[in-house]
Amino acid sequence: MRPIILASASPRRQELLKNLGLEFEVQVSDVDENLEENISSGQLVEKLAERKAAAVALIRTQGLVIGADTIVVLGDKPLGKPTNREEAVQMLSNLQGKSHEVFTGLAVIDASTGQRVVTHQVTEVNFKTLTKDQIERYVDTGEPMDKAGGYAVQGLASIFIDSIRGCYFSVVGLPISKLADALRMFGVEIV
């Protein structure tokens, strides 16, 4: 069987692949995640996921390389990962009591042929109304700092989520159903 390579350092993505029983290696892609193009959120996460997977596929001679990228979008404003405490508090203050969308791009590239599948998933997340004190206590845990939108749906922030419409796993960072479809196109069956 061809090796599967995850082009991500995300412990959450690694855990999701482990839960599927997939044997995989991790090789982090060191790519510029800034795109200056005026494109839709779906196109943005697809391009970034593909860029990450392609960078690793250039190094590897064989295997299936998985790249992913997640952004949170409130209204028409994309929210990346907060860079400091104040930014995390501001993001969560803006998200609380509202609905937002989470876009996760997925790219699977066959390193030996260059054949690729690139797609994305959109999920709607509804946050409860939060107090300033709740937000600050959550930010003080440190959990928001490496997460798009400043929260971890699978962590402590789960108590802030009123509802999710779409793919929970996509909010965590990897649209599992779409990944299974992409791997199947390359002859890899999960079950």
Swiss-Prot record:
Catalytic activity: dTTP + H2O = dTMP + diphosphate + H(+); UTP + H2O = UMP + diphosphate + H(+)
Residues the record marks as site: Important for substrate specificity: 12, 70, 154
Gene3D superfamilies: 3.90.950.10
Any Pfam family the entry gives: Maf
SUPFAM superfamilies: ITPase-like (SSF52972)
Any one biological process term the GO annotation gives: nucleotide metabolic process
Documented EC number(s): 3.6.1.9
Obligatory cofactor(s): a divalent metal cation
Membrane-spanning segments: none
GO molecular function, one term: UTP diphosphatase activity
InterPro entries xref list: ITPase-like_fam, Maf-like
GO cellular component, as recorded: cytoplasm
Keywords: Cytoplasm, Hydrolase, Nucleotide metabolism
Active site (record annotation): 69 (proton acceptor)
Primary localisation category: cytoplasm
Subcellular location: Cytoplasm
Signal peptide residues on this chain, from the entry's feature table: none
EC category name: hydrolase
NCBIfam families registered for this protein in UniProt: maf
Family under the similarity heading: Belongs to the Maf family. YhdE subfamily.
Its biological purpose: Nucleoside triphosphate pyrophosphatase that hydrolyzes dTTP and UTP. May have a dual role in cell division arrest and in preventing the incorporation of modified nucleotides into cellular nucleic acids.
Protein name: dTTP/UTP pyrophosphatase
Species, as recorded: Desulforamulus reducens (strain ATCC BAA-1160 / DSM 100696 / MI-1)
